[in-house]
Amino acid sequence: MRLRVVAVGRPRLAYARLGVEEYARRMRRYAPLDLVFVRKGEELLPKAEGHRKVVLDERGRLLTTEELYRRLLAWEGERVAFLVGGAEGHPEAVREEADLLLSLSPLTLQHELALLVLMEQLYRVLTLRAGHPYHRP
């Protein structure tokens, strides 16, 4: 599985930037990862061309870690892009192209925090796939 995370704007909050960098470093031990930052929401889709598209959206489906793991296993061998919008969310065109609209929480999360939570969950899924004991159900 080849993962790409495309986010609007680089994290400016120190804790988010450091956390995203740390989880990206850890994830690359288990799978190829591209971490791409764009300036505007309209730039997300071109960066996800040829990928399954998982769009983070507060109106999306809430999945457990195990459900996300199973969904990604079903896409094994494919390229999967996770699209994280900016402070204004996603343009409608991005939501319409989604293979999966995913909500990380019923709470509204600041976009940098949402990116950090996504990175941790992707790391968790990859360690689960590898049989590493990081995830404890």
Swiss-Prot record:
It catalyses: pseudouridine(1915) in 23S rRNA + S-adenosyl-L-methionine = N(3)-methylpseudouridine(1915) in 23S rRNA + S-adenosyl-L-homocysteine + H(+). Keywords: Cytoplasm, Methyltransferase, rRNA processing, S-adenosyl-L-methionine, Transferase. InterPro entries: Alpha/beta_knot_MTases, RlmH-like, tRNA_m1G_MTases_N. Gene3D superfamilies: 3.40.1280.10. GO terms for cellular component: cytoplasm. One of its GO terms (molecular function) is rRNA (pseudouridine-N3-)-methyltransferase activity. S-adenosyl-L-methionine binds at L56, G85, L104, S105, P106, L107, T108, L109. It is found in: Cytoplasm. The keyword Cytoplasm applies. Its EC number is 2.1.1.177. It holds the Pfam family SPOUT_MTase. It is an enzyme of class 2 (transferase). SUPFAM superfamilies: alpha/beta knot. Homodimer. Specifically methylates the pseudouridine at position 1915 (m3Psi1915) in 23S rRNA. PANTHER family: METHYLTRANSFERASE (PTHR33603), RIBOSOMAL RNA LARGE SUBUNIT METHYLTRANSFERASE H (PTHR33603:SF1). Belongs to the RNA methyltransferase RlmH family. This is Ribosomal RNA large subunit methyltransferase H. It comes from Thermus thermophilus (strain ATCC 27634 / DSM 579 / HB8). The lineage of its organism: Bacteria, Thermotogati, Deinococcota, Deinococci, Thermales. The gene is rlmH.
